[in-house]
């Protein structure tokens, strides 16, 4: 499918989430979708784990301290087949806008770092999970499986993809996205402290500036994509909610001002937001600009040697229990997107919801 729109306006969210409060998180999500719609945007990108906010406390606590916070976080995470998700999908429909949404997904007893791509009709075009939680994130989140790996989809605003946090640094994830001809990318980031907090031996890669100004433009250059980097911000009240009892409170400003948007040649396209800025970063996208960069270096095409270097990708779901298919032979698999209820068209989901 060729894109219908080659030129359009897009937005990246640079704002504070509704910390560990599902209802407030949904309200803020719909608010920013509405604001992007009013501004004439065709696409809006949210940060990693926007709902219900990134659990930054996990970097500060020991096991015992984590348990009350972990319980609250789980209680305020978002089930995919829920009234809250349908409200967000309906907001996308009302504004006729594509939405890349990052959230903590409840699936049975586990949580996952999930992204969905919602269409202007409110249907789910892509459901993916971060393939590996980073370091202490494994205290909270499980890993994605084969059928939640895909990040790039064809839409009428181009081939659009999204990844979470350090997936944007992963050379294999970038190579896979490049092979699919990605044109517009969401590098979704959570909450990161600034470089002024860095203490050896913590590496520089673990501060905001490294990811905002090195990792993100590198993704744009290497894939030839418009790369939107939505980012979470935090206030003094948010710091309190993220700080376990007995821990020192930090200055919220060290976390803010890192939202970015880069062109397919790596140029910064928007001014760096002020530390106190909360809102949307806007960009005018022209898909033909991608061709200029890709004509020089298309690592998914003419500038690669698959006869020498190839990447093996397995997109099959790995189930804990596998059932034999006695009719067709082999085994039966249930797609994750079907099992969590996201493949149901919004019209049907709304009807079922109204009947219950």
Curated annotation (Swiss-Prot):
Annotated GO biological process: cyanide catabolic process
Record-annotated CN hydrolase domain positions: 8-287
Induction behaviour: By cyanide.
Thermal behaviour (record text): Optimum temperature is 45 degrees Celsius.
Pfam families linked: CN_hydrolase
Stated family: Belongs to the carbon-nitrogen hydrolase superfamily. Nitrilase family.
Protein task: Catalyzes the hydration of cyanide to formamide. Degradation of cyanide may be important for plant pathogenic fungi in infection of cyanogenic plants. Can also transform some nitriles like 2-cyanopyridine and fumaronitrile.
Protein's UniProt name: Cyanide hydratase
Organism of provenance: Aspergillus niger
